[in-house]
Regions:
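Short beta->alpha transition motifs characteristic of CBS
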Residues: 8, 98, 105, 116-123
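Short secondary-structure junctions
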Residues: 25-30, 87-91
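Short glycine-enriched loop/turn motifs at secondary-structure junctions
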Residues: 1-3, 59-64, 97-98
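Conserved short beta-strand elements that form part of the metal-binding/catalytic scaffold
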Residues: 27-61, 113-118
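N-terminal beta-strand motif that seeds the catalytic metal site of vicinal oxygen chelate
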Residues: 1-15, 65-67, 120-123
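Short beta-strand-to-loop elements that line the ligand-binding cleft
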Residues: 8, 29, 93-96
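Amphipathic alpha-helical segments
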Residues: 14-26
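Vicinal oxygen chelate
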Residues: 13, 67-113
């Protein structure tokens, strides 16, 4: 068995597709009207449909999960994020951990937590 996808709930599929394309370069692999699979295995699920599926309230900003991305140029990504046309809610702007990795944490348009870190060698 292997993990195939990670699903996040979004309020506006079109805005979310644009967000993940513009900032992370993710393309649409499959669009099933309310359920969109992007490259890298990220799935965007329409909030109204998801609520019907699970019959539970959806909790934004739950801080229980995060999407993690790595980049070779974290400073350039930070500039790209600052210039994005939608407001970005930061958890922390560019910071450096004690082990030398630089990271930025923020929420997507629907309160899903994202971390972008500088690539560090496993050596």
């Amino acid at each position: 068995m292997k993990l195939k996808n990670v699903l996040i709930v979004v309020n506006d599929i079109e805005k979310s597709k644009k967000f993940y394309k513009d900032l992370f370069g993710l393309d649409v692999v499959l669009d099933n009207d309310g359920n969109v699979i992007l490259t890298e295995g990220l799935v965007l699920q329409d909030a109204k449909i998801w609520k019907e599926f699970i019959n539970k309230d959806i909790t934004s900003h739950n801080h229980a999960t995060e999407l993690y991305f790595e980049t070779t140029d974290i400073e350039e990504f930070g500039k790209k994020l600052d210039a994005y046309h939608e407001p970005i809610e930061y958890v922390n702007r560019l910071m450096e951990h004690s082990w030398g990795q630089k990271v930025i944490r923020f929420y997507d348009l629907d309160g899903n937590l994202i971390e972008v870190g500088s690539w560090i060698s496993a050596d």
